[in-house]
Amino acid sequence: MWTFPVDYDVIVIGAGHAGCEAAYCAAKMGASVLLLTSNLDTIAKLSCNPAVGGIGKGHIVREIDALGGIMAEITDLSGIQFRILNQTKGPAVRAPRAQVDKQLYHIHMKRLLEQVPGLHIMQGTAEALLDNGEKVLGVSTKEGWAYLGKTVVLSSGTFMRGLIHIGTQNFSGGRLGDAASLGLSEDLKRLGFPLGRLKTGTPARLLASSIDFSVMEEQPGDHNVCFVHRNEMFVPTLPQVSCHITHTTDQTKDLITKNLHRSALYGGRIEGVGPRYCPSIEDKIVKFADKDRHHIFIEPEGLNTQEVYVNGLSTSMPFDVQYDIIRSVSGLENAIITRPAYAIEYDYVHGNVIFPSLESKLIEGLFLCGQINGTTGYEEAAAQGLIAGVNAVNKVLRHPPFVPSRQESYIGVMLDDLTTQVLDEPYRMFTSRAEHRLLLRQDNAGMRLSHYGHSLGLLSSERYAMFQEQKACIEQEKERLSKTFRKYGDTVVPLTKVLCRPEVSYQQLLTEFPADVRDLGPVVGASLEMEIKYSGYISRQQTLIRSMERSENISIPEDIDYHSISALSLEAREKLSKFTPRTIGSAARISGISVADIQVLMVSLKKDAH
């Protein structure tokens, strides 16, 4: 086998959302990087919905931007509708979401990656890892040659032994139109990796000109919503479009009920478990039998195509049943299908063999990110890609790994969850997964995390200075307003107390007391308002975190023998040995580990220390 004459610091396998972020970040840190993908024309392809962000997910994209990653930038360049979800709810759960032009998203990502110094993008299909039994050495390809590298980042998406289901038909594929990767799964098994099987799905695509939008509810976008942190108002570069909302009918319900036995999911042909919070339409009909109808969202796939995505109508039914189901939906009576819906099963690696840095515990220098770790979603994948890319370079440079904590980021919540929990379904980020979500708002991601991005060499000094200035402005104005007393109603109170009232906004305060309130602009002003309005809750959460940190960050030696600690329960010994947590905090979050087990472990660690 011929070996390519260049040795790389980092080899990234797969150019989906995880792989693109990993390759970009590694190269920006000064590493020589190979990004290996089976098809250059599908770089950063949005395989499912034409959207980025949402509740929890939008928070992650803002964190990626704060750390110096690229998903936010590409989303803003490609966005054809921007919205803030949960506007009427509390600030912790408000989140940006964008409809993007799928073709432009790919084009912008490919163009950006091609301009990064030190990054070599190459078409080729990874077939097997090269290793010496302890350390990864590179990768061999289906085409018959090899690449050598000091580290390898594996971001295979749904391609590992991918199996596509449409009714009773199934065939190999990484997604519809692309071949599956068969060799990598076998190679990981050879190396001792425990593999599981998960499932996801995507709905049919329809021709917009065949849809009756007049019977649907129009859903326009919002103004001044974006993913890249800015001081100024955001004006999209592309024309903005609307989505539309329709619903299923009694006929839809009857069709699905009568044909359940023909569904790949209910016919017993699918082995993998699907995402609970993104169910197929047949799942909804079965599990919510009391509901007469379900909402369907019609989302445009781009400005230069008539194709639309039918959000809420994912299915693994046969194509003839899909045809009837679609035409039973209000406004879709004459719809023309351009691509069928399908379900896909794929292999993933269990989290107990992965460190929070995303390095494998079994083979040194091998990092895993994205759906191979059991997650679902572009945003979760991109965040893991950033972490894996950064830590692959840290490995080469012999620097300690970068692992943000769950107290300071949603990315940290995800890393901790993936490496301490047994997944029984694809992992999706929600704000409810974070214990301190009021501290992890989407508006303050830059103030929370930009110092990491700057120290890693990913975030420019100019952008870091912007975040520092925003933070300083908010702290100074909070202090000033707390000392500025004015009459409001019948009493004289500090202006911070006025802003704490639920009916008073920062803009109203600015209008009513123009001589006393500094105009920080709409972006920083909104953050100031949240910091003041929720200061009591924020202070309590910060106090709780400080009290927990004393035990949370106690390190556990890598060579600890849990089976020798007889006071631990049998379940605790087995699970701690399986997951090998690095800290007491991580150990405490493993399912089945009791408070008593943690107390025993801490006593044992103190004895060993003495």
UniProtKB/Swiss-Prot annotation:
**Which residues are noted in the entry as NAD(+)-binding?**
274-288
Keywords of the record, alphabetical order, are: Cytoplasm, FAD, Flavoprotein, NAD, tRNA processing
Q: Which cofactor does it need?
A: FAD
- Superkingdom is Bacteria
Membrane-spanning residues:
none
- List of residues binding FAD: G14, A15, G16, H17, A18, G19
State the Gene Ontology terms under molecular function.
flavin adenine dinucleotide binding
The main location class comes to cytoplasm
Q: Which PROSITE patterns match?
A: GIDA_1, GIDA_2
Question: What is this protein's function?
Answer: NAD-binding protein involved in the addition of a carboxymethylaminomethyl (cmnm) group at the wobble position (U34) of certain tRNAs, forming tRNA-cmnm(5)s(2)U34.
Quote the subunit structure annotation: Homodimer. Heterotetramer of two MnmE and two MnmG subunits.
The family this protein is said to belong to? Belongs to the MnmG family.
Per its record, how is this protein called by name?
A: tRNA uridine 5-carboxymethylaminomethyl modification enzyme MnmG
Q: Which organism is it from?
A: Chlamydia trachomatis serovar D (strain ATCC VR-885 / DSM 19411 / UW-3/Cx)
Q: What is the lineage of its organism?
A: Bacteria, Pseudomonadati, Chlamydiota, Chlamydiia, Chlamydiales
